[in-house]
């Protein structure tokens, strides 16, 4: 949850050995977060590339390893970087996601312009490198993985 105007650098963040049950969307990286006072402004929400300046957040490297998410509802993952400052690298290894039989509808991220959904797979946008290794998504409706504006996508 690092939107424009929140000048921060996130790098070498590792999440591992985690078990989740009955969560809406277990993996969310959202550069269009709307819960701050300026969250619904055009500056924060536009999907057009803006000039990079001191207010532009930077997310460099994130790793998710050995994680099981059971009985999920909305989406397996929703990863959305800025067009002007893509997320550097997201690596997901040994991930297993299943869905609740009666999955609730909901928003995959706190971001303007999204509709409610359920049983969605992984959605990734504006990332330099996305690595999915031994990632199992079971029970989704539609594609397990949808990528847009990814420079280097590796699936093993």
Model-flagged regions — what are they?
Residues 1-156:
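Extracellular/periplasmic carbohydrate-active domains that bind, remodel
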């Amino acid at each position: 949850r690092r939107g424009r105007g929140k000048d921060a650098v996130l790098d070498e963040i590792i999440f591992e050995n985690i078990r989740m049950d009955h969560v809406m969307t277990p993996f969310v990286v959202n550069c269009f977060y709307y819960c701050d006072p300026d969250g619904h402004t055009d500056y924060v929400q536009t999907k057009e590339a803006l000039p990079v300046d001191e207010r532009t957040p930077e997310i460099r490297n994130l790793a998710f390893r050995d994680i099981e998410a059971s009985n999920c509802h909305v989406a397996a993952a929703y990863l959305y970087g800025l067009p002007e400052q893509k997320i550097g690298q997201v690596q997901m290894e040994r991930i297993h996601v299943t869905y609740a039989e009666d999955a609730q509808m909901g928003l995959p991220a706190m971001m303007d312009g999204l509709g409610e959904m359920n049983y969605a797979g992984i959605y990734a946008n504006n990332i330099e490198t996305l690595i999915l290794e031994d990632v199992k998504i079971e029970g989704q409706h539609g594609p397990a993985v949808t990528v847009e504006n990814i420079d280097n996508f590796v699936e093993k």
